[in-house]
From Swiss-Prot:
This is Chitinase domain-containing protein 1. Residues 80-394 form the GH18 domain. One of its GO terms (biological process) is carbohydrate metabolic process. Residues 1-20 form the signal peptide. It comes from Xenopus tropicalis (Western clawed frog). Belongs to the glycosyl hydrolase 18 family. The gene is chid1. SMART domains: Glyco_18 (SM00636). It is found in: Secreted; Lysosome.
Amino acid sequence: MRLLSTLLFLVAATCPLIHATLSKTDSKKAASKAPETKTRLSDTLVQTRGLVSTDVKAKDIVLEHRSYCAKKLKERHVSADVLGYVTPWNGHGYDIAKTFAAKFTLISPVWLQIKRKGKEAYHITGLHDVDQGWIKDIRKTSKSTQIVPRILFDGWSYQDFESVFSSEDEIEELAGAMVQTAKDERFDGFVVEVWSQLGGQKRQELVHLLTHIGEALRLAKLRFILVIPPALAPGTDHLGMFGRKEFDQLAPVVDSFSLMTYDYSSPQRPGPNSPITWVQACIQLLDPESKWRKKILLGLHFYGMDYSALGASGEPILGNRYIEILKEHKPKLLWDQQIAEHYLEYKKNKGGKHAVFFPTLKSIQVRLDLAEELGTGISIWELGQGLDYFYDLL
């Protein structure tokens, strides 16, 4: 309990300070000439070019963001597992995965859903999104990179879950459908997302189900990655819906835990995407004795949030939109040491003041350093959302 109290104090002491980031000072309009962007790739890494800094300027991001090091695409800077998610609606993510495949140990295309069709009957959908040519390209670029599609328990009713929880035969059929699909499609395993669907209820029943799935996948020599919510609920001092007890129970049968240490703030409570003290607390609460740390994949976000002072609104933004904001408004980027994130402010003509939190090379590097210090891997949501030169850091 002493550890929990200490972690809660640290998070509470640092995170609320940034919630009032929309200052009264309007952004001043700079000269009309748009900043330039490099189109050529670089011979050196962003680390060598001095770009990983708290003192970063908008014009430098605009100039350099596409210029990753083409000569070191297979050079890794993270020794632990690195998982990258790819979604069908973001084609650039597919290209990024192919280009930087060697920097990832695991790539998870968000393709699949498992549906319950009746008693002991399961059907996996989304197979129309599977791109075997792309998988072949990934494996050609990096023989060690494993393809582990995410599978979502889609359209399940509470009664569906109850039926599975109460029947070993149901669990066996469900796990069997997953194993067969992996064999048919030549997948290396699955990322399973189900825990949050029951809102923290039926924890022991979920542990039982996932234990059986894990054992079936391991028997078939397939990887099992489980998506888990943060151990400390964002913006509160409450423990999350997946805690140390469940972690200890599942760690022996789960190969990796994809920990969602992002989405800390919201339009109703604008602020940082993943304050560093909160990220650290989420890991230490799950595994205070570092027994299974290498199985935790610290979640990194490659998207940002644009908050408006009008009506407590906000929306996610991707790299292209972020660059547009930098070009149009030429804002000053501010570094907050307590949360280890950059943010900026700008003003629309009739839209009021905005604050933008978007990852930078420095904020990503700080989290990579934390992962190394704590002995974890990382998972990235999602490839293609951020800026191309981010991948030099991996």
